[in-house]
Amino acid sequence: MNSFKLNTYVIGGPENIQERHLLPYETKSAALVRFVSLFSSLGLDVFQLRFKNSSDTDFIKLANEIVQVLKNTSCKLCIN
């Protein structure tokens, strides 16, 4: 059995992004992707996506955007 060395784990979704963290004209989903990209480039081990109160289409779109920014990192994506 493989064991993982996971030291950093972040759970979040667009609903966790506060207005003060948004760039001008940025959506909460875009800000989340930006944060995940930054954190994963700095060594984040796991990001757990929680996406409440939204359509399946929006969820899939956001998950795909996050997968794209995680491609060249060692960060794992967990979906809840």
What does each model-identified segment do?
Residues M1-N80:
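Conserved N-terminal beta1-alpha1 strand-loop-helix module at the mouth
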